[in-house]
Amino acid sequence: MAVKVITDSTSCIPKDLAEKYGVEIVSLSVIMNGESYKEVDIDSEAFYDELAKCDKLPTSSQPPMDEFYNAFEKFAKDGHDIVAAFISSKLSGTYTTSHIIKDMILEKYPDVKIDLIDSQTSVMALGIGVLEGAKAAQEGKDFNEVSKIVRNTIEESEIIFVPGTLENLKKGGRIGGAAALFGKMLKINPILTVKEGAVVVMDKVRTKKRAIDKIVEVVKQDLKEKGIKQAVVCHILAEDEAKDLAKRLKEELDLDSMIGEISAVIGVHVGVKSVGIAYARES
């Protein structure tokens, strides 16, 4: 039987690519003003307009257990093995819950092989690894090969971005209030990345232009030292800036990139006008 790949909605894989490569996506939800919104159904402009009116930062919730279980069972019942990669366990409980689902599935379908992966990252740094694995599965690679490709690609993945605001990071406890106020007063633009599963500050610069320059510099270094096999410019309602960055990467580095939106679960923390890049180095 074939190998199937499952991930969650924070991977930011576009619907057309998920369908093309047979990726099953389970959706996290964002809870705002007492209402729950499935991430895959969110209209970005309406969502962030509403977010701007909130005093309290929205929270996120894992996929419902029945939907989570059904995503696995639809493959297991046909005898397919499963490789599943999820958002960092330090950012969500989704990966932890997937172990409960795995145990339930194996009790009913003991011959199915399931590999669960804590990506230690999110957004398209996760999505790129999932897509590489799904492509390999479609090419007929076996369970161990697909698992290795997903793991290795994620391990070589990077996400670097400039948040649109420090306020949401402060509200969510990602940075301290004093740090947020200090950054706002001095117009400091932090450059963020994900290390060991958590969002951390890579660098701090005085303007967003310098932040973008720094991102290009980091990408250029990785391209020179290891090569880059896939890149996605990510943004939140900053399509023009994203296109400018993608154009710059092509003109200066001859690096092609897709353009995609940052997931709402992550977006509530980093805010509108966030822009950055996710990419996977050659392994």
Swiss-Prot record:
MF terms in GO: lipid binding
Residues that hold hexadecanoate according to the record: 60, 92
Entry keyword Hydrolase: no
InterPro entries in UniProt: DegV, DegV_C, DegV_domain_contain
Residue stretches in coiled coil: none
Entry keyword Metal-binding: no
Keywords, in A-Z order: Lipid-binding
PROSITE patterns attached to this UniProt entry: DEGV
Residues in DegV domain copies: 3-281
Protein role: May bind long-chain fatty acids, such as palmitate, and may play a role in lipid transport or fatty acid metabolism.
Protein's UniProt name: DegV domain-containing protein CPE0304
Species per Swiss-Prot/TrEMBL record: Clostridium perfringens (strain 13 / Type A)
